[in-house]
Amino acid sequence: MQAEQIVWDQALIEKYNYSGPRYTSYPTALEFNESFGYPDLVRAAGQYPARNLSLYVHIPFCHKLCYYCGCNKVITRHQHKADQYLDYLEQEIKAQAPLFKHRLVTQLHWGGGTPTYLNEAQTRRLMDMLREHFQFAEEGEISIEVDPREIELTMLDVLREVGFNRISLGVQDFNKAVQVAVNREQDNDFIRAMLERARALGFRSTNLDLIYGLPHQNRESFHHTL
């Protein structure tokens, strides 16, 4: 495969080269306060009854800690904890869905944590819960973040079967020294196999997540990753 030269827009870089909040949630944690009660939520939910919905489901569990991560997470290999989490999530879905019962879901995203921490049965259970309580658009975007270190290739078949049409592979960097430094070693050949499998299964969109600013990265190494 021939590498293409990357042209950087320096004006665009300078325009956005400043610090800002890290949106691990929206609104950010600082915006939450006790003055906003359930009646306020009900009023807010009813303000735009004709608008479509975007749903985000947070799966906080990870098998291993990535040293750069600032997301809300639980590091554990006790799979039963995910079952307990889904029990509580089901209560939340049942409580909130009636507020949006006439609105169409055009986007659904599972993030984390590691959404593919869930096994096949747990994945099917969660998707069934969502489809039972929300109305989904036929051509809506249904996406999930995938950790290529902690998934069987056949799990992509399950994800496609339950309705996912977009996957995002958390690669971050292909350089082994960088991977070791952030505790995220992975198999490049397996990532290639995942991309080929996703293409064969008909996923509408497949992307790779990359991070710049990790230990041992430089222009040359990141150019290799790109």
Please place each PLM-identified region on the residue numbering:
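Short beta-strand motif preference
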Residues: 55-57, 169
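Conserved non-cysteine loop/helix-boundary elements of the Radical SAM core domain that shape
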Residues: 73-100, 105-226
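Divalent metal-dependent hydrolysis catalytic cores, especially in the metallo-beta-lactamase
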Residues: 54, 67, 142
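Flexible, acidic/Gly-rich N-terminal and inter-domain linker regions that tether
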Residues: 1-53
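Short glycine/proline-enriched loop/turn "hinge" motifs that connect secondary-structure elements
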Residues: 48-49, 58-60, 101, 200
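Local cysteine-cluster metal-coordination motifs and their immediate loop/turn environment
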Residues: 57-73
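A short secondary-structure junction motif
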Residues: 28-31, 65, 74-75
